[in-house]
Design a protein with these regions (language model features):
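Secondary-structure boundary elements
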Residues: 1-37
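Extracytoplasmic/periplasmic, Sec-exported soluble proteins
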Residues: 2-3, 40-48, 75
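Acidic/polar residues at beta-strand termini and the immediately following turn/coil
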Residues: 18, 95, 210-214
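Short, well-ordered strand-loop elements centered on a beta-strand within folded domains, enriched
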Residues: 34-36, 40-42, 90-96
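Acidic, metal-dependent phosphodiester-chemistry machinery of nucleic-acid enzymes
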Residues: 35-39, 218-223
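Hydrophobic/aromatic-rich core segments of domains that either
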Residues: 47-122
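Low-complexity, Gly/Ser/Thr/Pro-rich intrinsically disordered linker/tail segments
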Residues: 105-213, 217-221
Length: 223
C-alpha cells in the first residue's frame, strides 16, 4: 500500500492535467503517453494510467489499465482511463487522474484520495461502461478505511470532526454509503461540520469544507 500511495502522492503533487490536449490531440500527443508525465509533468488520463501501470508493474505489483466512461460535474460524459491494482487477493480501482483534478474550497490543489482503492459499487457512482474479467468487491484497502475515516454514523462523524479540528490541520473523510443513507446526507455533513466548528472554536483560523458528492468524500482545509 505504501508504494502505491507514494506513486499516487507524487503524481498528485507533481503532474498537471493537460486540458489543452483534449482540444488538440495532434499537437499534444506526448500527454497521451508516459513521455508527457516524465518530461513535461503534463498528461491526460491515458498517459497517467500508463505511467501508474508501468511503475507498479516494474515494482512487482499487478496493475492494469481500465477503460470506460466518466460523468463530469457538469453531467458531460467523456471517455476515460484509470487503473485497477491487485492487493493480496482483491482488486481495487484507483483513478489518479481524478485525484489530480481535485481542488479544495479555496481552489487550491490538494492531495485527494477520493479514488484511491475503490470497489465497483463506489467507482460506479461516476465511472461506467468498464468491462474487466474480474470484480472489485473490497474496500479494505481504501485510503479512508485504512486511516479510520470511513464514517458510518453521525456519532463517528462528530468525533472525527472534533479530533480533526483540534489538530488544526487539513484532513479528509468518506461517508459509507448504505441502503439506509439518507438522500440529504450532504446537508447533514455540512450542518454537522458547521456545528463542530462552532462548538470546538476556531482558534483564530478559518475552516473550509469541500465535497465530492458522488463519492461522499469531504476535505477540510485550514485557512
Amino acid at each position: 500500500i505504501q508504494i502505491e500511495k507514494s506513486i499516487h502522492d507524487y503524481m498528485v503533487n507533481s503532474i498537471s492535467y493537460d486540458y489543452e490536449a483534449l482540444r488538440n490531440k495532434s499537437m499534444n500527443r506526448c500527454s497521451f503517453n508516459i513521455y508527457g508525465v516524465i518530461n513535461n509533468r503534463l498528461a491526460v488520463c491515458e498517459g497517467i494510467a500508463k505511467f501508474v501501470k508501468l511503475t507498479l508493474n516494474k515494482l512487482g505489483i499487478e496493475c492494469f489499465i481500465c477503460g470506460g466512461k466518466c460523468t463530469l460535474e457538469n453531467e458531460k460524459i467523456e471517455d476515460h482511463a484509470w487503473n485497477i491494482i491487485k492487493i493480496e487477493e482483491d482488486y481495487y480501482h484507483i483513478d489518479v487522474t481524478w485525484d489530480i483534478r481535485k481542488d479544495d474550497a479555496q481552489n487550491k490543489r490538494i492531495v485527494s484520495y477520493d479514488y484511491f482503492n475503490l470497489d465497483d459499487a463506489n467507482i460506479s457512482r461516476d465511472h461506467f461502461d468498464f468491462n474487466m474479467s474480474f470484480e472489485c468487491t473490497s474496500m479494505l484497502y481504501n485510503y479512508h478505511a485504512i486511516m479510520g475515516r470511513f464514517i458510518s454514523g453521525k456519532k463517528q462523524l462528530i468525533q472525527l470532526l472534533s479530533d480533526g479540528l483540534a489538530l488544526g490541520k487539513n484532513f479528509s473523510f468518506r461517508i459509507k454509503r448504505t441502503i439506509n443513507t439518507p438522500d440529504n446526507i450532504d446537508d447533514i455533513v455540512v450542518e454537522t461540520f458547521n456545528e463542530s466548528v462552532k462548538y470546538n472554536g476556531t482558534n483564530g483560523k478559518q475552516y473550509y469544507l469541500s465535497a465530492n458528492k458522488s463519492q461522499l468524500t469531504y476535505y477540510v482545509t485550514v485557512g
